[in-house]
Amino acid sequence: MKQGIHPDYHPVVFEDSSTGYKFLSGSTATSSETVKWEDGNEYPLIRVEVTSDSHPFYTGKQKFTQADGAVDKFNKKYGLK
């Protein structure tokens, strides 16, 4: 492997900004903000909007927002049904 071309890979704490859930993972991302983890060490903190803790696919709480379809629009326009 060539030296000096690979990014620094280190432990980072990710926090879900909508639920407050935190998890420790390895990443090349870095932050000036740090947080003390359960093991007593301080790690960089990266805030993210969506994680598996808040994403509808993983939580099973999906919201189906469906606009009127073409058939419904046609029926409304011509007074059918």
Curated annotation (Swiss-Prot):
One of the record's GO molecular function terms: structural constituent of ribosome
Protein's GO biological process: translation
Keywords from the UniProt entry: Ribonucleoprotein, Ribosomal protein
Keyword Secreted: no
Pfam family, one: Ribosomal_L31
A GO-annotated cellular component: ribonucleoprotein complex
Entry superkingdom: Bacteria
Subunit structure of this chain's protein: Part of the 50S ribosomal subunit.
Family designation: Belongs to the bacterial ribosomal protein bL31 family. Type B subfamily.
Record protein name field: Large ribosomal subunit protein bL31B
Species name: Limosilactobacillus reuteri (strain DSM 20016) (Lactobacillus reuteri)
